[in-house]
Amino acid sequence: LEPNQLNLFPDVKATPPARTEGLVMSEAALLRWKSQIFDYQQRVRETKPVQQVTLFDLAPKHCDPDRIDPLFLRLVPMSFYRMPADSPGDACLYFVVDSAAGLLLYVGETCKSNQRWKGIHGCKDYIASYQDLHYRYGLQTAVNAAFWWDAPTDRRARQELELSLILKWRSPFNKENWQLWGQPFG
C-alpha cells in the first residue's frame, strides 16, 4: 500500500494461494496408455495397405508413406543435435522412438536437420516428462531419434508426408493425436 492509500480491509492478511501438486499418471495408467498405442501401431505395421486401382497411369509419388516404418530406421541417440555440424543439414523426416517399448512417439519434418532440435522444441519437454515418469516407476525406456533422408525438398510435399505419417501411426506426442491419446506429458 502507498502511504496515503486507504486500506479497506486492515485485518485481512494476504496469503499466497496453496499450490497443488500436478497430477501424476499412475504406473498402471502409464502401462495401459503405452499398451494401447503399441497395439494400434502393431496393427498398422501388420496390415497391408489397400492398393488403389486407377484408370490412368499416374506417376508414382516420390514418397510413399506406406513404405516408411520408423522402427526399422537406424536409431541415433537423442543427443544427436548437440554434435558439431558443418552445415545446416538436409531436408528429412525425423522420428522419436522408444525402442525399449517399440513405440513411435513423434513424427516431424525439417529442411535443416542439423538445426531443428538445437533451439526450443516442445517435444524435448514431452520426452523429459516421459522419461521422468518411467524413472519414477523403475520402468525402462530407450528414447532415440531416427531419420528418413529421402524426404521431398519441397516444404509443402514434406509437410503432407509428415501429416500422413502422423495420422497413420497416431504418434502420441504430435498435437494432431492429443485428442485420441491425451496429453499426459505436455
Task: Identify what each model region corresponds to.
Residues R32, K118-H121, P172-F173, N177:
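Generic N-terminal leader/processing signal
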Residues E2-C111, R156, P184-G186:
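GIY-YIG nuclease catalytic motif and its immediate N-terminal context
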Residues W148-G186:
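Structure-specific nucleic-acid interaction/processing domains
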Residues P84-D86, K112-Q159:
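Conserved short loop/helix modules at catalytic or binding sites
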Residues Y94-V96, G122, L165:
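Generic structural hydrophobic/aromatic packing signal, biased to beta-strands
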